[in-house]
Amino acid sequence: MSWAPVLLMLFVYCTGCGPQPVLHQPPAMSSALGTTIRLTCTLRNDHDIGVYSVYWYQQRPGHPPRFLLRYFSQSDKSQGPQVPPRFSGSKDVARNRGYLSISELQPEDEAMYYCAMGARSSEKEEREREWEEEMEPTAARTRVP
């Protein structure tokens, strides 16, 4: 396998968090093809990530953003349509962080990745939100060139 870097640019969005930026992501990350990378989305300390779902989106060059996944807890999460299981979410409540892990990095993973925080919702509301987000997504963005 040849070594090729994958660069990730991170942007964040938080609904209902007020006018000040409350999320932080490193501006870019890179890793070799075939490896696993973990993107971090950190919520400011005066907010509690434990009460939010973490949403992740991907935008490839020349394409609109697409919903990847929502993660609230190991027992309360959802994957976007046709999103492979090598994309997975997690949270570290003690560090106030959400994570997106991408295993077996592939060339097509080069994209912008968006992180967003939102209130926990029911499965029905989640399906409706996914449909709306596919039509007009609102999320933070991370670029993987």
Swiss-Prot record:
Annotated stretches, region: Disordered: 121-145
Paired cysteines (S-S): C41-C115
Gene3D superfamilies noted in UniProt: Immunoglobulins
Region annotation (Framework-1) ranges: 20-41
Record GO cellular component, one term: immunoglobulin complex
Ranges where the record places region Framework-3: 82-115
Keyword Endoplasmic reticulum among record annotations: yes
Region (Complementarity-determining-1), start-end ranges: 42-56
Domain Ig-like V-type: 20-132
Composition-biased stretches (Basic and acidic residues): 121-130
Framework-2 as annotated region, ranges: 57-70
Keywords noted in UniProt: Disulfide bond, Endoplasmic reticulum, Immunoglobulin domain, Signal
Highest taxon, organism lineage: Eukaryota
GO biological process: immune response
Coiled coil: none
Region described as Complementarity-determining-2: spans on this chain: 71-81
Signal peptide: 1-19
Alphabetized PANTHER family for the sequence: IMMUNOGLOBULIN LIGHT CHAIN (PTHR23267)
Reported function: Associates with the Ig-mu chain to form a molecular complex that is expressed on the surface of pre-B-cells. This complex presumably regulates Ig gene rearrangements in the early steps of B-cell differentiation.
Family: Belongs to the immunoglobulin superfamily.
Assembly behavior: Interacts with IGLL1. Interacts with SYNV1/HRD1 (via N-terminus); this interaction leads to increased VPREB1 ubiquitination and degradation in pre-B cells, possibly through a lysosomal, not proteasomal, pathway.
Protein known as: Immunoglobulin iota chain
Organism: Homo sapiens (Human)
Lineage: Eukaryota, Metazoa, Chordata, Craniata, Vertebrata
